[in-house]
From Swiss-Prot:
Protein name: Protein nucleotidyltransferase YdiU
UniProt keyword annotation of Heme present: no
Gene field: ydiU
HAMAP family: YdiU_SelO
Binding site for Mg(2+): 249, 258
UniProt cofactor(s): Mg(2+); Mn(2+)
Organism from which the protein derives: Escherichia fergusonii (strain ATCC 35469 / DSM 13698 / CCUG 18766 / IAM 14443 / JCM 21226 / LMG 7866 / NBRC 102419 / NCTC 12128 / CDC 0568-73)
Active site: 248 (proton acceptor)
Amino acid sequence: MTLSFTTRWRDELPATWTALNPTPLHNARLIWHNAELAHELAIPQSLFADNKGAGVWGGEALLPGMSPLAQVYSGHQFGVWAGQLGDGRGILLGEQLLADGTTMDWHLKGAGLTPYSRMGDGRAVLRSTIRESLASEAMHYLGIPGTRSLAIVTSDTPVYRETTETGAMLMRLAQSHMRFGHFEHFYYRRDIEKVQLLADFAIRHYWPHLQEEQDKYAIWFRDVVARTASLIAGWQTVGFAHGVMNTDNMSIMGLTLDYGPFGFLDDYNPQFICNHSDHQGRYSFDNQPAVALWNLQRLAQTLSPFIAVNALNDALDSYKQVLLAVYGKRMRQKLGFYTEQNNDNDLLNELFALMAREGSDYTRTFRMLSQTEQNSASSPLRDEFIDRAAFDSWFSRYRARIQTEQVTDDERQLQMKSVNPAVVLRNWLAQRAINDAQKGDMEELHRLHDVLRNPFNDRDDDYSRRPPEWGKRLEVSCSS
């Protein structure tokens, strides 16, 4: 089957991009590809047959119909206007036309210098490329919307960061790479025509059912708010911290975008900061919902020339309601509650307080809670707590709550295990795969990808256990 690509962004959004080809790496080699995703998108396996990576994965060739470009956008970084940014190391190769009429961006990250590289070299390192690849697939299989990873290429090209590292490329796929920052770029240049052109493009291609609506812009923005709220609720339920929630890293589609110094909670700490450059804790785990709303307010400002202020405010006011509704539903599922009762939030908050006091492992706590039997006062989770009396007090009230549901233990346990993963991408697991890959051994990279495809399966091994002490102390920066 021949792949078909369109050039909609290039054709319909002039002055938002610069045309250029990728700069190949030296001696590029394909080290991993996503066979399942390739099958879903009808991408021929023959494209991955050349183990030396001499092809589209390493920026050495283009497929018919591709017309590569780098996009320009701006943004607020750590709450401060940063001005022009743009694709500093990534190139949009093309938009694949899918059988259902939708498209999928092919975005090559680490593709070399662009006009938007600023002081950078346009490259990505193997370390960050592996992290993003693992994270995007882990989040997908946890049910959280985001970009996908199709292939990783390594090379003999040295890249200079804090130390000399290995140059790499990642083929990243997404329904769209349109960011809040695209709108900000033209708004702050007083080019409102381009802002509206971006909105028209989004509605025409991603919200086509709104095209004939009289208030299409207001309805569209309200859905962007809802998608963002739902995304953040998903992050909070799986214990994911993004680390760099700048407006240029926010997707209008409600996708997790740009995996940098992210982290999943190990010990439950609501003030968890995964980015060691975030000295003020702006992007701490507990602050993510508020930051997302702040970012939406910045987007709303760019749309104010053609959406009424009251409509923008109404949409922004709906954020909290959607966030709490989605978060509440997911947390009730994690607790095994089929109905909503008045004291559910109190029960959850009391558990969180106990976990924070004890430093309980976030993922393991909810997974082990999935084994609860409503008529048994014993629980394997009890051994995870030092203050047994406090746990017993909470657990007795929890058992009383699940006894109000007309559900068998087997049914509830099965349901809870379907939403409480046994495995998440802990930093130490990613680092172990990276360490091996940097030595030329890709076995753990492939194995970890396979494990992350089935996060809800029962297992009792390194992937589901608490991290070792050294694994808890890993610091991650924005360097990539």
